[in-house]
Structure formats: structure tokens, C-alpha cells
């Protein structure tokens, strides 16, 4: 049986670094699973659009697609935007929407990879406070998930972990940095819980001016690519609801 095509659904951005990072991540996914067809579509700003990719797949005779939101939390885009776009797909396509990437232990591993690349070592954990800096959301579920991830991560040995948000929610990154200083952590690191560079990650970076360490975005980290494949495999389970025919 032919495997469903994996369609990675990215938000898109006017910042060219965003699309470049998405494409680099997709190339890593392809390298991890040769033979799996992986396509990329954007909701806005970049091409190809999700709708355009779906129409092209339909014209080729593809019938089975897993649409994977390139999102870390289940907020508005995953709940409303993406289902609305998929509902407009050609009726002959059978489309299953996969779960968003987070939360996942692999993403915590990717965050730590970025912190170590920025200069920390495992020996620094107990004396380092970390700001888990996300893009932000007005969705209560997404906010609660970020807070839960911070609590879970704290139990892996860090001095403390505080969530922060670049938009829509509080606290901001700079406030979380100050809180960790007040707790007495010997050093403070900021770990952006975002997938690609852009406007909000740049805001996180500015808010990290008072920190000792600023990690890079998650980007094409190997652990992120593995999460994509996990979500793809999970969506292939027949009991998941399909969008379309």
C-alpha cells in the first residue's frame, strides 16, 4: 500500500529566514525517511500555498494525505485556520490532520541541544535558570501547555524554569529573566520555544538582553524532525477523523 503524502503546513512569514528554516527542516525529515514523499505548503505570505499543493497532488492522482501543522501548540491556527483550508481541498483527496508537534520529550531534548550549542554544559543545569520563551497565544489551552512544559522541564535538573510569551500573554521574556535573577540562579538562559526566525523570535531575543545565554530557535534540530515523523505515523491510524472524502 502506498504511504500517504506528508504535507507540512507552515504558517509563513514576510521574513525570508522563516521559509528557509522550514525548508531545511523538511529536508531533514526526508533524509530520515527516504521514500516518504514530503511536501510543504504555507498558510500565508509564502508559496506554495497549502491549497495549491493539495490541488497539484490531486491532479497527480494522489488520494491520501497527512496534513501536519508545523505548530508547537494547539491554538487558533490548528483549531480553525488549517481545518478551514483542508475543508476546501479537492473532494477526491482523503486528508487526515495530524496533531501539532508539542508537547513532546523530543522537543525538550531539542531545547537543551540549542542551550548546549549556545555555551551551556550539563554541569551548568543546577545553577542555571531557564526562560521558556514562546511566541504567545490568547488561547488558554496553549498558555496552559507552555506552563506545564516549563514545570516538567524544571524537574530535569535546572535551577528553575519560567515560561514567557512574546505576544498576547504575560510575562514577557525580560520579566521572566528578572524573576530568575531574583531567585538567585547563578546564570540565566533564554530558550526560544519557536520553530523558525521571524518577528516574534526577534522580540524574544531583545527581551533576552539581560540574560547570560540566548539559544537559537529550534529550527531543523534532529529531534524536531523526529517529532514530525512521529506525528505523521500517529495520523496514519485509521481511527483518526478525516477531512474531505
Can you describe what each PLM-predicted range is?
Residues 1-245:
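Active-site-proximal alpha-helix that buttresses catalytic centers in soluble enzyme cores
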Amino acid at each position: 500500500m502506498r504511504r500517504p503524502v506528508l504535507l507540512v503546513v507552515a504558517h509563513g512569514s514576510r521574513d525570508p529566514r522563516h521559509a528557509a528554516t522550514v525548508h531545511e527542516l523538511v529536508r531533514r525529515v526526508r533524509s530520515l525517511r527516504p521514500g516518504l514523499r514530503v511536501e510543504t505548503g504555507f498558510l500565508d505570505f509564502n508559496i506554495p500555498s497549502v491549497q495549491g499543493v493539495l490541488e497539484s497532488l490531486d491532479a497527480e492522482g494522489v488520494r491520501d494525505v497527512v496534513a501536519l501543522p508545523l505548530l508547537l501548540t494547539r491554538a487558533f491556527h490548528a483549531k480553525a485556520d488549517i481545518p478551514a483550508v483542508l475543508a476546501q481541498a479537492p473532494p477526491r483527496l482523503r486528508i487526515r490532520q495530524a496533531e501539532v508537534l508539542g508537547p513532546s520529550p523530543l522537543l525538550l531534548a531539542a531545547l537543551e541541544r540549542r542551550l548546549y550549542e549556545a555555551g551551556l554544559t550539563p554541569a551548568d543545569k543546577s545553577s542555571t535558570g531557564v526562560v521558556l520563551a514562546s511566541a504567545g497565544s490568547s488561547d488558554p489551552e496553549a498558555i496552559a501547555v507552555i506552563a506545564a512544559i516549563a514545570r516538567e522541564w524544571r524537574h530535569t535538573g535546572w535551577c528553575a524554569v519560567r515560561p514567557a510569551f512574546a505576544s498576547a500573554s504575560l510575562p514577557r521574556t525580560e520579566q521572566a529573566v528578572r524573576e530568575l535573577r531574583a531567585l538567585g540562579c547563578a546564570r540565566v538562559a533564554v530558550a526560544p520555544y519557536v520553530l523558525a526566525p521571524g518577528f516574534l523570535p526577534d522580540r524574544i531575543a531583545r527581551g533576552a538582553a539581560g540574560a547570560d545565554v540566548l539559544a537559537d530557535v529550534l529550527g531543523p534540530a534532529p529531534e524536531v524532525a523526529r517529532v514530525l515523523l512521529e506525528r505523521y505515523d500517529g495520523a496514519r491510524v485509521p481511527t483518526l477523523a478525516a477531512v474531505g472524502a
